[in-house]
Design a protein with these regions (language model features):
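Conserved C-terminal helix/tail region of periplasmic/extracytoplasmic solute-binding proteins
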Residues: 301-328
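Secondary-structure end/capping motifs
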Residues: 232-309
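Solvent-exposed, polar/charged alpha-helical surfaces in well-ordered, non-transmembrane soluble domains
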Residues: 71, 75, 79, 93, ...
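Short, glycine-/small- and polar/acidic-enriched structural segments
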Residues: 29-162, 169-172, 188-194, 218
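Pocket-lining segment of extracytoplasmic ligand-binding domains
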Residues: 90, 170, 176-265
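Sec/Tat signal peptide C-region and signal peptidase I cleavage site
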Residues: 21-27
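Bacterial N-terminal signal peptides that target proteins for export
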Residues: 1-12
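Bacterial N-terminal signal peptides
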Residues: 10-20
Length: 328
């Protein structure tokens, strides 16, 4: 964790520079929101179908900024360059420890459910890598070092005698280019997430090495968090945003056909590929009201603390008494 936290000063400064144009002179009307891909259907609906949300563009506006993963958004939140953003429990907790971030979890996007999809690491069919132990001295791709998938990934490696800090070369490879990186030999193994996993599986030539559910079942992958100072200063504005996140989730689940189009537009992924998994039993899980599962998040924080990745942490610090999905 120290190696990740040592980057905070530089990374936070970079986040401010990247988002310098996102001034907060009209903070009461505008929210600066970070997003990423995949699995943020409520936000994709808000971006692609804004007319479906009566308050959006009228009562308040959103300034959207895309990131590769949750860890850079944590840094941007801590630097005050974002107001709300997609987060993973580990990246958010690292923001508290390394960046003095104070935030509220206001909604939840996706989680791993029994029998559903679990983020996994793949190798080529002809790879000599057969077990996790075989990853020693290999180049491994991960979406973001220190992001949401890093925690259970690192725990699985350690359990199998591989030190993720010393025994492998860990490189950042975005989900969208994971398949290409693997097939071209730039990495020996790489993490796969939907819809890119479905696309790669359809082509063949790769196989699953391990999935995160083997170490940590029922993972809360991504949630929505807002800076506590921003929420406390602008409660009505954030309530409007959380109402729209709630509404967006309901729209996504109620109209799968339109959601396929929305996600296709946002991810530039063909509808036939998305149709193989999106909002089906083999997909990630979604709460119908985008409600955060604080009990599950606490269990994840406890596991991270028990393995030395984080100090002991109480999820209660992330709970706002009234501003949390579902809001009507």
């Amino acid at each position: 964790m120290m190696r990740i936290l040592s980057k905070w000063i530089v990374a936070a400064g970079a986040a401010v520079a990247v988002l310098a144009s996102a001034n907060s002179s009209h903070a009461q009307q505008k929210i600066r929101v970070g997003w990423t891909i995949p699995a943020e259907e409520s936000k994709y609906w808000m971006m692609r179908r804004p007319a479906e949300f009566p308050d959006l563009g009228k009562t308040y506006n959103i300034e959207w900024t895309q990131f590769q993963g949750t860890a850079p958004m944590t840094q941007a939140l801590a630097a005050g360059a974002l107001d709300c953003a997609t987060q993973a429990p580990l990246s958010l907790a690292n923001g508290v420890v390394g960046g003095n971030l104070k935030a509220y979890i206001v909604a939840q996007h996706v989680f791993e459910k029994p029998g559903g999809f679990s983020v996994y690491w793949a190798v080529k069919d002809d790879s000599p890598i057969k077990t996790i132990a075989d990853l020693k001295d290999k180049t491994i791709g991960i979406s973001v070092i220190g992001g949401g998938t890093y925690g259970p990934f690192a725990m699985l490696l350690k359990k199998n005698g591989v030190d993720p800090a010393k025994d492998i070369k860990l490189v950042e490879v975005g989900f969208a280019v994971s398949e290409d990186a693997l097939r071209q030999g730039r990495v020996d193994a790489v993490n796969m997430n939907q819809p890119f996993a479905a696309r790669a599986e359809a082509k063949g030539g790769i196989r699953k090495l391990f999935s995160l559910s083997e170490e940590m079942p029922n993972i809360v992958h991504i949630l929505e968090a807002c800076r506590a100072d921003f929420v406390d200063k602008n409660p009505d504005l954030v309530k409007a945003y959380v109402r729209d996140i709630t509404s967006g989730m309901k729209k996504a689940l109620a109209n799968r056909e339109e959601t396929l189009k929305v996600v296709s537009e946002q991810l530039k992924a063909p509808v036939p590929v998305l149709d193989t998994y999106l909002l089906k039993d083999n997909d990630l899980g979604r709460d119908p009201g985008a409600a955060p599962n604080f009990d599950a998040i606490q269990k994840m924080l406890d596991i991270y603390a028990a393995t030395g990745m984080l100090p002991k942490m109480d999820v209660a610090q992330f709970k706002h008494p009234t501003i949390v999905a579902p809001l009507q």
